[in-house]
């Protein structure tokens, strides 16, 4: 099954909201919530994709003709490429009835592990969502990162107790999920966290801890102060706040401020291996890609994620070769035009 065939299959089964577009740029689903759309006018979601397209590559092939190495190491694990499947949930609500969260996570986590990368998994008000994700991660030898919503402290600690039993490579919290419209007013409540509260959560987790939803230098510094091992520069795919800058726009300043002090991941509108190269050149250590992995699972089942990973890795390696970078460590900001 090839990439085009998977896209075709996904269009037939991904429900009324996601169109499984050839390029997942947000134009067809824009403000569609339920569905994969953005909050408000969807300006943030659309800007994420658009700004990566405005970054241009400086080619330079006067260099050694050597093999390209895309391998990436984080928290003691080595991956085929600096790519993670991003956090998504409420699959039936947003993407169609073919998969519930438990089945989706089973397929995603195991398929990503087989493809040489790892998946972030989601959380929800139904305890079975986290339980199912943790079961999938444990079955894959810990090759996955459960993402806990910013619930009240009692609920967060209970979730972390469950996480510990699965022994994942790390644990994450999407701190910006407090802005999701469909989490408003639910029980347990979700909301923002102080540095001290995050410090308590991180101490309790006893695992490398990733704070997702960082969009400012000050936010990155607070995550570092709280003891985070990594951050994800993210605006939740444009789903939590309208009229925000893109992740491509804020990444360089954040990387300049905290790069080397913690691991920096980024998501939001990255759609091919060239985009991944741009993110690494701007200071990220790795990337998360969300919505396209949904399309791959819906259209290709267990085969889908591996097809996407292979495509992204090949595109990344090709861009590296055309810029004279033979390893991720050799990717520099001046390989981008105007930087």
Each model region followed by its residue ranges:
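An N-cap/entry alpha-helix motif that binds or orients negatively charged groups
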Residues: 2-80, 331
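Flexible, glycine/proline-enriched loop segments at strand-loop-helix junctions
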Residues: 95, 120-122, 144-151, 184-189
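Long, hydrophobic, well-ordered secondary-structure blocks that form the structural core
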Residues: 118, 128-155
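Short hydrophobic alpha-helical runs that function as membrane-insertion/retention elements
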Residues: 118-123, 145-147, 232-233, 287-289
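N-terminal functional module of multi-domain proteins
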Residues: 44-130
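Short beta-alpha connecting loops at secondary-structure transitions
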Residues: 294-305
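N-terminal pre-core extensions flanking Radical SAM catalytic domains
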Residues: 311-329
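Alpha/beta enzyme core
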Residues: 110, 139, 151-266, 273-296, ...
């Amino acid at each position: 099954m090839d990439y085009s065939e998977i896209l075709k299959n996904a269009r037939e089964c991904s429900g009324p909201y996601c169109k499984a577009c050839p390029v997942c740029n947000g134009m067809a689903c824009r403000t569609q919530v339920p569905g994969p759309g953005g909050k408000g006018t969807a300006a943030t979601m659309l800007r994420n994709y658009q700004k990566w397209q405005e970054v241009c590559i400086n080619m330079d092939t006067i260099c050694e003709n050597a093999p390209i190495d895309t391998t990436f190491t984080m928290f003691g694990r080595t991956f085929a490429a600096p790519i993670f499947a991003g956090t998504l949930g409420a699959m039936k609500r947003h993407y169609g009835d073919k998969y519930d969260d438990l089945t989706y996570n089973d397929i995603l986590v195991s398929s990503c592990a087989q493809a040489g990368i790892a998946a972030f998994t989601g959380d929800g008000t139904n305890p079975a969502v986290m339980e199912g994700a943790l079961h999938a991660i444990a079955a894959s030898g810990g090759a996955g990162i459960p993402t806990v919503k910013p619930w009240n402290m009692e609920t967060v600690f209970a979730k972390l107790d469950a996480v510990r039993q699965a022994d994942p490579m790390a644990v994450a919290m999407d701190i910006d999920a407090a802005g999701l419209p469909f989490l408003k007013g639910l029980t347990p409540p979700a909301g923002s966290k102080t540095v001290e509260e995050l410090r308590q959560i991180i101490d309790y987790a006893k695992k490398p801890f990733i704070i997702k939803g960082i969009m400012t230098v000050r936010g990155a510094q607070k995550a570092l102060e709280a003891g985070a091992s990594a951050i994800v520069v993210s605006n939740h795919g444009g789903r939590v706040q309208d009229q925000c800058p893109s992740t491509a726009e804020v990444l360089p300043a954040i990387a300049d401020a905290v790069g080397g002090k913690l691991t920096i991941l980024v998501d939001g509108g990255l759609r091919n291996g060239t985009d991944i190269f741009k993110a690494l050149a701007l200071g990220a250590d790795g990337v998360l890609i969300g919505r396209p992995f949904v399309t791959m699972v819906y259209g290709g089942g267990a085969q889908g994620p591996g097809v996407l990973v292979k495509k992204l890795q090949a595109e990344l390696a090709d861009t590296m070769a055309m810029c004279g970078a033979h390893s991720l460590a050799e990717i520099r900001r001046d390989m981008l035009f105007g930087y």
